[in-house]
Design a protein with these regions (language model features):
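Contiguous beta-strand/loop segments that form the cofactor/metal-binding neighborhood of enzyme cores
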Residues: 1-76, 103-113
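A generic "alpha-helical surface" signal
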Residues: 2, 97, 121-124
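Hydrophobic/aromatic residues within well-ordered alpha-helical segments
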Residues: 7, 98-102, 126
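Short secondary-structure transition/capping segments
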Residues: 26, 82-84, 129-131
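Short acidic, glycine-rich loop/turn motifs
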Residues: 35-39, 81-86
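C-terminal helix-rich "cap/oligomerization" subdomain common to oxidoreductases
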Residues: 38, 105-137
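Generic detection of short hydrophobic beta-strand segments and adjacent strand-loop junctions
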Residues: 88-92
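Active-site loop of classical SDR/Rossmann-like NAD(P)-dependent oxidoreductases
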Residues: 93-104, 118
Length: 137
């Protein structure tokens, strides 16, 4: 959700349904949500953290009037762009240390030689959306 808000703007309305289907732990493991960004763009998402591995899918689809863009969040599958002109695959190499920039930023902040931009204030919009989806607000 933070990636989507970074791309499309702040989510201003959100609602969700959630349940604990597998009872492996206390947290919700199956979630369905719908939301609207500040520009009026609608979005929806479904997450099931206890589904069979044959049903595992990691895909965000952005559908617009000129085509569709789909990409993975956790896997480094090629980005797919589909338009009236056809399908294009865009390969983005896996960075060697994906967490390194945030770790470096935190360390430099603690050493007083930099400023970490990830703060509780910057996390608030995503936390608000999560709480709305989970029915906690």
């Amino acid at each position: 959700l933070d990636l989507l808000q970074d791309i499309f703007g702040v989510i201003t309305r959100a609602h969700g349904y959630c349940s604990n289907r597998a009872h492996l732990y206390k947290a919700e493991d199956t979630i369905s949500a719908c939301f609207f960004f500040e520009n009026g763009l609608p979005g929806s998402g479904s997450w099931c953290f206890v589904g069979h591995k044959s049903a595992k899918e990691d895909c965000i689809e952005v559908i617009g009037e000129k085509g569709m863009l789909s990409f993975s969040v956790y896997n480094y599958d090629p980005i797919q762009l589909v338009t009236s002109e056809g399908r294009t695959s865009i390969v983005v190499p896996n960075p060697p240390y994906v967490q390194l920039p945030i770790i470096r930023s935190v360390i430099e902040h603690l050493q007083g030689i930099g400023t970490c931009t990830c703060t509780s204030v910057s996390a608030t919009p995503v936390n608000w959306v999560l709480d709305r989806i989970l029915g906690k607000l």
